[in-house]
Amino acid sequence: MYSSPLCLTQDEFHPFIEALLPHVRAFAYTWFNLQARKRKYFKKHEKRMSKDEERAVKDELLGEKAEVKQKWASRLLAKLRKDIRPECREDFVLAITGKKAPGCVLSNPDQKGKMRRIDCLRQADKVWRLDLVMVILFKGIPLESTDGERLVKAAQCGHPVLCVQPHHIGVAVKELDLYLAYFVRERDAEQSGSPRAGMGSDQEDSKPITLDTTDFQESFVTSGVFSVTELIQVSRTPVVTGTGPNFSLGELQGHMAYDLNPASTGMRRTLPSTSSSGSKRHKSGSMEEDVDTSPGGDYYTSPSSPTSSNRNWTEDMEGGISSPVKKTEMDKSPFNSPSPQDSPRLSSFTQHHRPVIAVHSGIARSPHPSSALHFPTTSILPQTASTYFPHTAIRYPPHLNPQDPLKDLVSLACDPASQQPGPLNGSGQLKMSSHCLSAQMLAPPPPGLPRLALPPATKPTSEGGSSSPTSPSYSTPGTSPANRSFVGLGPRDPTGIYQAQSWYLG
C-alpha cells in the first residue's frame, strides 16, 4: 500500500472542477475564511474581534497566494459536485459556463428532506447552506451563514426547496437595505464630485438634498471592514487568472495510475493510496452517506443525465484542457478506442496524453483573466461510453509496479473471465489453474476491510468428463520452466469451501 504525501491532488483536476474554477470569485475565499477566523476568535477569547484585528485578517486573506485560493476552490467544488444529483451535474456546468440556459439543479437532501449544509473549510465547525455557498461562490455576495432566509428562488424555479442553481437564487432586499444604499450612494457621489445619479423623476433630482452625516454616523455603525469600493472590486475578481493554476507539477504528481486497456471490458486499477495521517476513509456507494468528506477523499462520478444532449461539455473542451481519470468512474463502462480519422486533432491530442496520467493545469490559457472557457466547433474525441474520459492510452508510472499482487487480487475478484495472474512480488510465481485459491495459500486477512466472495470455478477435463475444481500449484523460483517441480496442495475440504472462496483485500 502506498502512502501519498499530498492526498488531495488526485481529485483536483476533474473536468467538473476545471470547467467551473474560472467562474469562482476570489472573494469567496476571503469571506469564508474571515467568518471562520472571527468565530474561532470569539470562542477562544469570548469577545469579538476589534476592527483593527479584523482588518489585519482581511488584508492577510486578500494577499494570500493564488495557488492557495485555487486549491481551496478545487476542494470546495469537488465537495459541491458530490452534493449535486448526478443527473444535474452536466446541466449545472453548462449553465455556469454559458453553454445552456439555466435550469433547476437539484441537490441531495438531508435526512429531513431539506437543503443540506456543508463546511467550506477544513475542520471548520461553521456550516453553510448549499444555496448560500453557491451564491457566495459564483456571485460574490457577502452573505452570513444565518442569511438563508434572505434567499429567494426565482419564479421559474420548479424545485425551490432543493435547487442550488445560482441563476435561480436571489437575495431579498429589505427597506433598511434600500435606506442604507441611498446614503452610501450619496456619499460616493460627494467624494467623487460627480452629480448624483437619478433616483426617480427629473423634478425629484432637481431638489437639493442635504445629508446630515453626523446623524447618519450616530444612527448606523459599520460592522464590517470592507469599504464599498473595495467590496465591489474584490467580489468581481475571479479566483483564477489567464495564467492558470500555479500548482507545481512535481508537487501534484499523485498515485493516479490506471491500466485502462481498450481491449478488455474489465478495468484493472490499483488500490487507492492512503495517507499516513489517515485522512482518507473507505467510501460506500451511497451518495447520501458521503456528507462531508476530507479534501483527500474519493469523489465518485456519476453517469451523465439521460435527458441531456448527445454531445457533452467535456467533449467540446480545448486540447489544452484534459480530463484526468478518476479511480471509480470507469469501473462499469467499456472503453472504446477512437480511430484517428474521427477528429483532425485526435492524433496530436493523444500524443500529449499517452505516457502517464500527469496532473494538468486544467485551465485554458487566455489573455482575458475573467473570460469563460473557449470551446471548439468540432469535437476532439468521438462519442464514447464514458463522456468524462477522452484518454485512450494510459500507462503506469515507473515508480508503481503494474504487476502489484493487490491489483491482481482485485482483478481476480472483479473479472473472473480474464484471469491471468502475474508474478507475486517478483520472487515467486503463483500458477493458477482455477479462479479460486485454497485456504492454505492465503495470508492472514487484515482486519476491518471489506469482504469479497469469489465464485468457484470448474475446469473441464481433457477426456470430456465431468468438471471438477483443480488445485493451484506452486512453482519454486530460481529454476528453469522445464525443470520446475510443481507441488499440488491436494483437494480442498468440502466443509471449508466457503472459507476458501472468500478473503480480505488489503
UniProtKB/Swiss-Prot annotation:
One of its GO terms (cellular component) is nucleus. One of its GO terms (biological process) is positive regulation of DNA-templated transcription. The modification Asymmetric dimethylarginine is found at residues 365, 395. The modification Phosphoserine is found at residues 194, 294, 302, 304-305, 323, 333, 337, 339, 343, 473, 475, 485. It is found in: Nucleus. The modification N-acetylmethionine is found at residue 1. A motif (9aaTAD) lies at residues 404-412. Residues 1-195 bind DNA. Binds DNA as a homodimer. This is Nuclear factor 1 C-type. The gene is NFIC.
